[in-house]
Amino acid sequence: MINIKFPDGSIREFESGVNSLQIAKSISPSLAKITVGAYIDNKLSDAKDVINHDCELRLITTKDTEGLEILRHSCAHLLANAVKELYPNTEVTIGPVIDNGFYYDFSFKETIGEADLANIEKRMKEIAKKGSSISYKVVSKEDAIAFFKAQGENYKVDIIESIPADQQIKIYTQGDFSDLCRGPHVPSTAAIKAFKLTKLAGAYWRGDSNNEMLTRIYGTCWATKEDLDQYLHMLEEAEKRDHRKIGKALDLFHFQEDSPGIAFWHDNGVRIWREVEDYMRASNKKYGCGEIRTPLIADFSLWEKSGHASKYAENMFATKSENRDFAIRPMNCPTCVQVYNTKLHSYRDLPIRMAEFGIVHRNEPSGSLHGLMRVRSFTQDDGHIFCAPEQVEEEVILMVKQCFEVYKDFGFNDFTVKIALRPENRIGNDETWDKSEQMLKNALDANNVAYELLPGEGAFYGPKIEFHLKDAIGRSWQCGTIQLDFSMPDRLGATYIDKNGNKQVPVMLHRAIVGSLERFIGMLIEHYAGNMPLWLTPVQVAVMGISNHQDEYCQKVFETLEKNGIRAKLDLRNEKIGFKIREHTLLRVPYLVILGKSEQEQEIVTVRKHNGEDLGQMSIGDFCAFLNEQIEAKK
């Protein structure tokens, strides 16, 4: 007999050789139906893995985040299974889980389109209904290569050849279909019930444009049909709110192949940009952050010292000049440290807070680029705080307070906080990481801020607090970060003199509140479906006359609005008033001022909102006061 300890502390005896699925069934048949995996002594395992020793066990169900990931990854394999049955000559490549779903890349010998997805999905449902048991076997590297070579799966062979010699290789099988995978998977295809294939896209093998273009099929998978239906409805809403479409319709920005992944900002877009940047500049000043500006390009030796060259080189753009190697910065922190290093600092000077709207460039794969949400060049609202270890918690609390304030002002009232812990690829020793992670936990605990832990998700130089914002249709966006760093100040020679006259290395706190301004503006556009709050919208008021007889009065009203700090647009075109109203309504201008003979004679304005609500007539002075009151209140 073996002893199994459960998360609630209870211990039960089972026969040796039992598996997690059987244990779940012994507790409740309904629990077994939704069990898709388990943590056995904190190791993620398949639900049918045999247990022969005393252990701690946590069952994973489809209600858990990990359970959904297992379900979705299994659905990706179900997709590959269906494709191989329908298109036997197709080669399969990779099929990872992504947010809310999965994708799988295929090398088809024939051309397929969106219309083929329904047939593939139908076959997936047929396979799932068979309820084929899913199992795996561990094989040697040589046997795995031989197995997939025999099947003509050259991409799988390529993957296996790059697997380190000491890494375990598993082949999962369901029915007649086998695939390479680390797992875990659901116990049976019958567990995969609520899924939908959503779109096709192209993707280069291994993200390299020199390689073959593959066909990527995206899908989503959920625990229940109700969850799936809710998500599909959200997708419909998201389609309507797509910032790329709205950005084009409102003349905010555009992209073109001459500069892939880098936005061309138009006047209307720059107006929003300025409001966001000016707001953050004022917030930084309020919270004691001075502003700096540092070089975009630095000698490659700086990036070697900072650790970026060894940990981040594949994402960096490099260049050469006069026989010197340079890199365009992927992050702002090393150049900020250089500003700190220009002076001697005493413990009395700390904390020293520096903010920078720094442009960074990252060599993101072309297939991952997505409008403003994933770009190769963006401006980060970075802040770097140099402080003594005993000041860390107080500084983190202050930054958390600033983040909460900023998000609420921009209309995000629902957000969660997470702590991303040490990744596998990192600098610094475990003792330093232990101390860093505990400091962030202490700061949040002291401020009564609830948080989740994200193992392995920290930056290579330190753990970080993440702020995840929920938008108007329920999507979660990872936005701001607060990162604790003991390593970089030391590597770059940052010091201060302590009260005993000794040199010490300061702790460096990296923080970004809105993060990438490009991405944050994209989030705002989708959150508000283009109907931005008055204080953010590019044009706040459109002034128009019923006929050209009102042109002079329209000009006067327009100038008065401008003098009162209102962003107004004057429309004197010789068009029908209905046409003008429709056009400015489509452009999401919040307020329309319509002037006719009566308004001109009384020197008043008639105002309507872009949604058609009539606010009636008022003096221009009252209208300006009304607008400025809303702007001040961030409405």
Curated annotation (Swiss-Prot):
Q: Name one GO molecular function term.
A: threonine-tRNA ligase activity
Protein name, per record? Threonine--tRNA ligase
Q: Which UniProt keywords apply?
A: Aminoacyl-tRNA synthetase, ATP-binding, Cytoplasm, Ligase, Metal-binding, Nucleotide-binding, Protein biosynthesis, RNA-binding, tRNA-binding, Zinc
> What is the originating organism of this protein?
Francisella philomiragia subsp. philomiragia (strain ATCC 25017 / CCUG 19701 / FSC 153 / O#319-036)
This protein's source sits in the domain of life called Bacteria
Q: Which Pfam families match?
A: HGTP_anticodon, TGS, tRNA-synt_2b, tRNA_SAD
User: How are cofactors bound according to the entry's free-text note?
Assistant: Binds 1 zinc ion per subunit.
Coiled coil region boundaries: none
What residues bind Zn(2+), as annotated?
A: C333, H384, H510
**Annotated Gene3D superfamilies:** 3.10.20.30, 3.30.54.20, Anticodon-binding domain, Bira Bifunctional Protein, Domain 2, Threonyl-trna Synthetase, Chain A, domain 2
Catalysis: reaction(s): tRNA(Thr) + L-threonine + ATP = L-threonyl-tRNA(Thr) + AMP + diphosphate + H(+)
The entry's localization annotation reads:
Cytoplasm
